Swiss-Prot record:
Active site location: P2, E3, K58, R284
Protein's UniProt keywords contain Zinc-finger: yes
Quaternary structure and interacting proteins, as annotated: Monomer.
Gene3D superfamilies for this protein: 1.10.8.50, MutM-like, N-terminal (3.20.190.10)
The protein, known as: Formamidopyrimidine-DNA glycosylase
GO terms classed as biological process: base-excision repair
Amino acid sequence: MPELPEVETVRRGLIPAMEGVRIARVTAHRNDLRFPLQTDFVARLGGRVVTGLGRRAKYLLADLDSGDVLLMHLGMSGSFRVAMDGGQEATPGIFHHPRSESRTHDHVVFEMDNGAVISFNDPRRFGYMKIVARADLEAEPFLKALGPEPLGNEFNAAMLAQACAGKATSLKAALLDQRVVAGLGNIYVCEALYRAHLSPKRRASTLASRTGAPSGHAERLVPAIRTVLNAAIEAGGSSLRDHRQTTGELGYFQHSFQVYDREGEPCRTRGCKGTVKRFTQNGRSTFWCPSCQK
Protein backbone atom coordinates (compact mmCIF):
# COMPACT_ATOMS: atom_id res chain seq x y z
CA MET A 1 0.00 0.00 0.00
CA PRO A 2 1.35 3.47 -0.82
CA GLU A 3 2.51 5.58 2.08
CA LEU A 4 2.45 9.35 2.43
CA PRO A 5 5.46 10.10 0.16
CA GLU A 6 4.07 7.96 -2.66
CA VAL A 7 0.65 9.63 -2.49
CA GLU A 8 2.24 13.08 -2.34
CA THR A 9 4.30 12.21 -5.42
CA VAL A 10 1.12 11.17 -7.24
CA ARG A 11 -0.59 14.41 -6.19
CA ARG A 12 2.23 16.55 -7.54
CA GLY A 13 2.29 14.57 -10.77
CA LEU A 14 -1.45 15.02 -11.34
CA ILE A 15 -1.51 18.79 -10.73
CA PRO A 16 -0.50 19.84 -14.28
CA ALA A 17 -3.26 17.71 -15.79
CA MET A 18 -6.04 18.38 -13.25
CA GLU A 19 -5.70 21.51 -11.16
CA GLY A 20 -7.66 24.46 -12.52
CA VAL A 21 -9.04 22.31 -15.35
CA ARG A 22 -12.63 21.41 -16.18
CA ILE A 23 -13.62 17.75 -16.30
CA ALA A 24 -15.16 17.35 -19.75
CA ARG A 25 -16.27 13.76 -19.32
CA VAL A 26 -16.08 10.90 -16.82
CA THR A 27 -16.45 7.25 -17.76
CA ALA A 28 -16.84 4.56 -15.11
CA HIS A 29 -16.11 1.22 -16.76
CA ARG A 30 -16.97 -0.62 -13.57
CA ASN A 31 -18.16 0.62 -10.20
CA ASP A 32 -17.26 -2.35 -8.02
CA LEU A 33 -14.02 -1.07 -6.57
CA ARG A 34 -13.32 -1.63 -2.88
CA PHE A 35 -16.60 0.21 -2.32
CA PRO A 36 -19.18 0.73 -5.10
CA LEU A 37 -19.15 4.12 -6.79
CA GLN A 38 -22.08 6.35 -5.90
CA THR A 39 -25.00 6.17 -8.32
CA ASP A 40 -24.59 9.87 -9.17
CA PHE A 41 -20.78 9.69 -9.34
CA VAL A 42 -20.46 10.52 -13.05
CA ALA A 43 -23.16 13.20 -13.02
CA ARG A 44 -21.60 15.10 -10.11
CA LEU A 45 -18.17 15.22 -11.76
CA GLY A 46 -18.97 16.03 -15.38
CA GLY A 47 -18.44 19.72 -16.22
CA ARG A 48 -16.88 20.54 -12.86
CA VAL A 49 -13.58 22.40 -12.46
CA VAL A 50 -10.90 20.92 -10.19
CA THR A 51 -10.03 24.01 -8.15
CA GLY A 52 -7.36 22.32 -6.05
CA LEU A 53 -5.69 18.96 -5.56
CA GLY A 54 -4.71 18.19 -1.99
CA ARG A 55 -3.77 15.29 0.23
CA ARG A 56 -4.81 14.10 3.67
CA ALA A 57 -2.69 11.22 4.95
CA LYS A 58 -2.87 8.60 2.17
CA TYR A 59 -5.94 10.15 0.51
CA LEU A 60 -6.04 12.44 -2.52
CA LEU A 61 -8.61 15.25 -2.32
CA ALA A 62 -9.79 17.00 -5.49
CA ASP A 63 -11.75 20.17 -4.67
CA LEU A 64 -14.49 20.94 -7.20
CA ASP A 65 -16.17 24.24 -8.07
CA SER A 66 -19.50 22.69 -7.04
CA GLY A 67 -18.45 22.60 -3.39
CA ASP A 68 -17.86 18.86 -3.53
CA VAL A 69 -14.59 17.04 -2.93
CA LEU A 70 -13.55 13.90 -4.79
CA LEU A 71 -11.91 11.60 -2.24
CA MET A 72 -9.52 9.06 -3.79
CA HIS A 73 -7.48 6.20 -2.33
CA LEU A 74 -5.04 4.11 -4.37
CA GLY A 75 -5.55 0.90 -2.41
CA MET A 76 -2.85 -1.72 -2.94
CA SER A 77 -2.23 -1.41 -6.68
CA GLY A 78 -4.11 1.65 -7.92
CA SER A 79 -2.45 4.20 -10.19
CA PHE A 80 -3.33 7.16 -12.36
CA ARG A 81 -2.19 7.02 -15.99
CA VAL A 82 -2.01 10.43 -17.68
CA ALA A 83 -1.98 11.13 -21.42
CA MET A 84 -1.56 14.84 -22.16
CA ASP A 85 -3.38 16.02 -25.30
CA GLY A 86 -2.98 12.79 -27.21
CA GLY A 87 0.66 12.34 -26.27
CA GLN A 88 2.47 9.47 -24.64
CA GLU A 89 1.09 8.24 -21.34
CA ALA A 90 2.84 8.87 -18.04
CA THR A 91 2.18 7.45 -14.60
CA PRO A 92 2.56 9.74 -11.57
CA GLY A 93 3.80 7.88 -8.51
CA ILE A 94 5.63 4.58 -8.06
CA PHE A 95 3.90 1.62 -9.70
CA HIS A 96 4.93 -1.89 -10.64
CA HIS A 97 1.85 -3.62 -12.03
CA PRO A 98 1.95 -3.53 -15.85
CA ARG A 99 -1.09 -2.16 -17.56
CA SER A 100 -3.03 -4.66 -19.63
CA GLU A 101 -3.20 -4.13 -23.39
CA SER A 102 -7.00 -4.33 -23.22
CA ARG A 103 -7.08 -1.67 -20.51
CA THR A 104 -9.47 -3.85 -18.55
CA HIS A 105 -8.05 -2.42 -15.34
CA ASP A 106 -8.88 1.19 -16.29
CA HIS A 107 -11.95 1.51 -14.10
CA VAL A 108 -12.51 5.29 -14.10
CA VAL A 109 -11.39 7.65 -16.88
CA PHE A 110 -11.39 11.45 -16.66
CA GLU A 111 -11.25 13.43 -19.91
CA MET A 112 -10.13 16.98 -19.15
CA ASP A 113 -10.74 20.20 -21.08
CA ASN A 114 -6.99 20.64 -21.59
CA GLY A 115 -6.84 17.42 -23.60
CA ALA A 116 -5.50 15.26 -20.78
CA VAL A 117 -6.95 11.80 -20.31
CA ILE A 118 -6.49 10.49 -16.76
CA SER A 119 -7.23 6.81 -16.15
CA PHE A 120 -7.52 5.18 -12.75
CA ASN A 121 -6.00 1.73 -13.20
CA ASP A 122 -6.34 -0.80 -10.39
CA PRO A 123 -5.81 -4.53 -11.05
CA ARG A 124 -6.71 -5.59 -7.50
CA ARG A 125 -9.61 -3.13 -7.10
CA PHE A 126 -8.77 -2.21 -3.49
CA GLY A 127 -8.75 1.48 -4.37
CA TYR A 128 -11.86 3.61 -4.12
CA MET A 129 -13.39 6.99 -4.90
CA LYS A 130 -16.14 8.91 -3.17
CA ILE A 131 -17.67 12.36 -3.65
CA VAL A 132 -18.20 14.25 -0.40
CA ALA A 133 -19.62 17.72 0.20
CA ARG A 134 -16.83 20.01 1.40
CA ALA A 135 -18.95 20.95 4.43
CA ASP A 136 -19.16 17.28 5.42
CA LEU A 137 -15.50 16.41 4.85
CA GLU A 138 -14.39 16.58 8.49
CA ALA A 139 -17.14 14.15 9.45
CA GLU A 140 -16.25 11.70 6.68
CA PRO A 141 -15.60 8.31 8.34
CA PHE A 142 -12.39 7.74 6.36
CA LEU A 143 -10.91 11.03 7.57
CA LYS A 144 -12.37 12.05 10.91
CA ALA A 145 -10.24 9.74 13.07
CA LEU A 146 -6.94 10.63 11.41
CA GLY A 147 -4.17 12.14 13.49
CA PRO A 148 -2.09 15.16 12.48
CA GLU A 149 -0.03 15.34 9.31
CA PRO A 150 3.60 14.48 10.12
CA LEU A 151 4.81 17.32 7.89
CA GLY A 152 2.34 19.84 9.31
CA ASN A 153 2.87 22.45 12.00
CA GLU A 154 0.59 20.63 14.43
CA PHE A 155 2.91 17.64 14.60
CA ASN A 156 5.61 18.16 17.23
CA ALA A 157 7.28 16.34 20.12
CA ALA A 158 4.73 17.55 22.68
CA MET A 159 1.80 16.38 20.58
CA LEU A 160 3.40 12.98 19.91
CA ALA A 161 4.27 12.50 23.58
CA GLN A 162 0.71 13.30 24.61
CA ALA A 163 -0.72 10.87 22.04
CA CYS A 164 1.57 8.06 23.26
CA ALA A 165 1.42 8.73 27.00
CA GLY A 166 0.29 5.63 28.86
CA LYS A 167 0.34 3.41 25.76
CA ALA A 168 1.59 -0.10 26.49
CA THR A 169 1.96 -0.88 22.80
CA SER A 170 5.28 -0.82 20.96
CA LEU A 171 6.60 2.41 19.53
CA LYS A 172 6.37 1.07 16.00
CA ALA A 173 2.74 0.02 16.45
CA ALA A 174 1.88 3.46 17.81
CA LEU A 175 3.43 5.21 14.81
CA LEU A 176 1.48 2.98 12.43
CA ASP A 177 -1.76 3.92 14.20
CA GLN A 178 -3.32 6.51 11.88
CA ARG A 179 -5.05 8.10 14.88
CA VAL A 180 -1.66 9.00 16.36
CA VAL A 181 -0.08 10.37 13.19
CA ALA A 182 -1.53 10.16 9.69
CA GLY A 183 0.08 8.71 6.60
CA LEU A 184 2.98 6.72 8.03
CA GLY A 185 3.49 3.13 6.91
CA ASN A 186 5.89 0.29 7.50
CA ILE A 187 8.79 1.46 5.35
CA TYR A 188 9.10 4.98 6.68
CA VAL A 189 8.46 4.04 10.31
CA CYS A 190 11.37 1.58 10.14
CA GLU A 191 13.57 4.26 8.57
CA ALA A 192 12.56 7.00 11.03
CA LEU A 193 13.13 4.80 14.08
CA TYR A 194 16.57 3.92 12.76
CA ARG A 195 17.43 7.58 12.18
CA ALA A 196 16.29 8.42 15.73
CA HIS A 197 18.20 5.41 17.15
CA LEU A 198 15.04 4.10 18.82
CA SER A 199 14.05 0.46 19.07
CA PRO A 200 10.78 -0.51 17.37
CA LYS A 201 10.14 -2.68 20.45
CA ARG A 202 10.36 0.28 22.85
CA ARG A 203 7.14 1.09 24.70
CA ALA A 204 5.35 4.02 23.09
CA SER A 205 4.76 5.53 26.52
CA THR A 206 8.48 6.30 26.85
CA LEU A 207 8.00 9.26 24.50
CA ALA A 208 6.48 11.08 27.48
CA SER A 209 8.29 11.85 30.72
CA ARG A 210 6.68 11.32 34.12
CA THR A 211 5.40 14.89 34.00
CA GLY A 212 3.85 14.32 30.58
CA ALA A 213 6.40 16.50 28.81
CA PRO A 214 8.08 15.06 25.71
CA SER A 215 11.11 12.94 26.48
CA GLY A 216 14.38 13.17 24.60
CA HIS A 217 13.20 10.20 22.55
CA ALA A 218 10.24 12.20 21.24
CA GLU A 219 12.48 15.19 20.55
CA ARG A 220 14.68 12.97 18.35
CA LEU A 221 11.87 11.09 16.67
CA VAL A 222 9.83 13.98 15.27
CA PRO A 223 12.66 15.50 13.19
CA ALA A 224 13.68 11.99 12.10
CA ILE A 225 10.16 11.37 10.74
CA ARG A 226 10.15 14.70 8.91
CA THR A 227 13.61 14.13 7.43
CA VAL A 228 12.78 10.65 6.15
CA LEU A 229 9.46 11.73 4.60
CA ASN A 230 10.90 14.83 2.94
CA ALA A 231 13.80 12.84 1.52
CA ALA A 232 11.41 10.22 0.13
CA ILE A 233 9.18 12.86 -1.48
CA GLU A 234 12.21 14.55 -3.02
CA ALA A 235 13.35 11.19 -4.41
CA GLY A 236 9.91 10.40 -5.78
CA GLY A 237 9.02 7.77 -3.22
CA SER A 238 9.99 4.10 -3.12
CA SER A 239 9.62 1.80 -6.13
CA LEU A 240 8.92 -1.37 -4.16
CA ARG A 241 6.12 -3.55 -5.49
CA ASP A 242 3.26 -1.41 -6.77
CA HIS A 243 4.29 2.22 -6.99
CA ARG A 244 5.82 4.28 -9.79
CA GLN A 245 5.78 8.04 -10.47
CA THR A 246 3.24 9.73 -12.76
CA THR A 247 6.05 10.18 -15.27
CA GLY A 248 6.44 6.41 -15.35
CA GLU A 249 9.87 6.65 -13.73
CA LEU A 250 10.85 4.68 -10.66
CA GLY A 251 11.36 6.40 -7.35
CA TYR A 252 14.87 6.37 -5.95
CA PHE A 253 14.39 6.50 -2.18
CA GLN A 254 14.74 2.71 -1.97
CA HIS A 255 18.43 3.24 -2.78
CA SER A 256 18.69 5.33 0.40
CA PHE A 257 17.17 2.75 2.74
CA GLN A 258 19.24 2.48 5.88
CA VAL A 259 17.53 -0.60 7.32
CA TYR A 260 14.41 -1.48 5.34
CA ASP A 261 14.88 -4.64 3.26
CA ARG A 262 18.57 -4.80 4.29
CA GLU A 263 18.46 -7.89 6.52
CA GLY A 264 21.92 -9.29 7.20
CA GLU A 265 23.77 -6.23 5.92
CA PRO A 266 26.07 -4.07 8.08
CA CYS A 267 24.53 -1.15 9.97
CA ARG A 268 25.33 2.16 8.29
CA THR A 269 25.64 4.16 11.51
CA ARG A 270 29.20 5.39 11.83
CA GLY A 271 31.08 3.37 14.44
CA CYS A 272 28.35 0.73 14.79
CA LYS A 273 29.45 -2.84 14.14
CA GLY A 274 25.92 -4.24 14.24
CA THR A 275 23.94 -6.02 11.55
CA VAL A 276 20.46 -5.20 10.29
CA LYS A 277 17.92 -7.71 11.59
CA ARG A 278 14.36 -8.51 10.58
CA PHE A 279 11.52 -9.80 12.72
CA THR A 280 7.76 -9.94 12.42
CA GLN A 281 5.91 -7.36 14.47
CA ASN A 282 2.12 -7.10 14.40
CA GLY A 283 2.09 -9.11 11.18
CA ARG A 284 4.64 -6.92 9.37
CA SER A 285 8.36 -7.15 8.76
CA THR A 286 10.39 -4.85 10.97
CA PHE A 287 13.97 -4.00 10.02
CA TRP A 288 16.32 -2.53 12.62
CA CYS A 289 19.80 -2.56 14.11
CA PRO A 290 19.65 -3.97 17.66
CA SER A 291 23.12 -2.58 18.36
CA CYS A 292 22.32 1.12 17.95
CA GLN A 293 18.53 1.28 18.28
CA LYS A 294 17.65 1.21 21.96
